[in-house]
């Protein structure tokens, strides 16, 4: 499965929840996550997508991830449809108990 297929599945999954998954490009800052995801319960996530086999974070992507986590923001690295399904399932649970 290609990364673009995973990305399209993420967009579809987020939109079925009523959220948005915007493409994130920053010309002056390499390593930023692929998508900023805003969910209806107020959660905002920085989401990096990689292909299932061999997809690894580049050094600048790891630095970005560490900075996002240090700032106590939400970050996810998703590599396949199953992980996206689990991630959206966890969101649904948080929404029910939150």
Label for each model-derived stretch:
Residues 1-98:
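Catalytic phosphate/metal-binding cores of nucleic-acid and nucleotide-processing enzymes, i.e., regions
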């Amino acid at each position: 499965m290609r990364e673009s297929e995973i990305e399209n599945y993420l967009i579809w999954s987020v939109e079925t929840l009523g959220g948005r998954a915007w493409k994130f490009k920053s010309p002056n800052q390499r390593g930023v996550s692929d998508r900023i995801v805003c969910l209806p319960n107020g959660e905002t996530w920085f989401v990096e997508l990689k292909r299932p086999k061999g997809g690894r974070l580049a050094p600048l992507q790891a630095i970005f991830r560490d900075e996002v986590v240090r700032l106590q923001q939400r970050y996810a690295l998703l590599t396949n449809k199953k992980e996206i399904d689990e991630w959206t399932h966890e969101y649904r649970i948080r929404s029910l108990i939150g």
